[in-house]
Regions:
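A short, internal acetyl-CoA/4′-phosphopantetheine-binding micro-motif in the GNAT/acyltransferase core
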Residues: 78, 88-97, 126
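Active-site/acyl-donor-binding loops of N-acyltransferases
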Residues: 140-162
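Conserved acetyl-CoA-binding loop-helix of GNAT-fold acetyltransferases
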Residues: 91, 97-114, 137
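Conserved GNAT acetyl-CoA-binding A-motif
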Residues: 84, 112-129, 150
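Glycine-rich acetyl-CoA-binding "A-motif" of GNAT/NAT acetyltransferases
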Residues: 66-70, 134, 147
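Conserved beta-strand in the GNAT
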Residues: 56-60, 67-76, 86
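Short amphipathic alpha-helix that is part of the acyltransferase structural core
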Residues: 1-48, 60, 170-197
Length: 197
């Protein structure tokens, strides 16, 4: 038996549950891409949820032994695109094709409806030259259609650390003309000219 549990306190009483929830995403990433996966850690996901630019709701699928075998979330922008919701439904690779994804999708879609999110966005991924193992077929059966293909590329840095250090501290490298600026919870008005958000 699988139980779907709402995660309401990822920093306190449900901290371990949230960590196990995040691990489902990492297990999926490792399954697909090995050590080159881009899944975020539980700490990174907690931090992302602290901003005021989005509201996230998360659920875990827990099996009869108390293990988290699936994870879902609905991410809703709060400042623009207010009809949009990003959904993520992931089942641990060892527990797929048993209905867990469908169980997780139900509360995710219900929450989207309750928050008037009429445009749901999701993504799936696979290695170049391969095929999607489960996401596209699952989504199609649930009424979703593919709309955009995005290529993910990775560039391995040279292993020569001394060469990297020299390049980053080289005199006359042109870095003096650049400034790194960071903002939280949206882009300041004065930065918006010429940018799309």
């Amino acid at each position: 038996m699988v139980t779907i549990t709402l995660i309401e306190d990822p920093d306190g009483g449900q901290r371990r549950l949230f960590d196990d929830w995040a691990e489902v995403f990492a297990a999926d990433g490792r399954h697909l891409f090995g050590p080159d996966h881009t899944s975020r850690s539980a700490a990174e996901l907690r931090e992302m949820n602290r901003g005021s630019d989005r509201h996230s709701i998360s659920w875990s699928a827990i099996d009869g032994d108390g293990r988290v075998i699936g994870a879902a979330c609905l991410v809703m922008p709060q400042h623009d695109n207010l009809a949009q919701g990003g959904i993520n439904v992931v089942v641990h690779p060892d527990h797929r094709r048993r209905g867990v994804g469908s169980l997780l999708l139900e509360p995710t879609e219900a929450a989207a409806r309750a928050h008037d999110r009429t445009l749901l966005l999701a993504e799936t991924q696979w290695l170049a030259g391969g095929r999607d193992e489960s996401g596209e077929e699952f989504a199609a059966r649930k009424g979703y259609a593919g709309a955009q293909t995005i290529l993910r590329s990775s560039l391995s840095l040279p292993a020569d650390r001394a060469r990297l250090a020299a390049a980053s501290t080289a005199a006359g490298d042109g870095a003096d003309g650049y400034v790194l600026r960071t903002c939280w919870d949206g882009i300041p008005e004065e930065w918006l000219a010429g940018r799309a958000e």
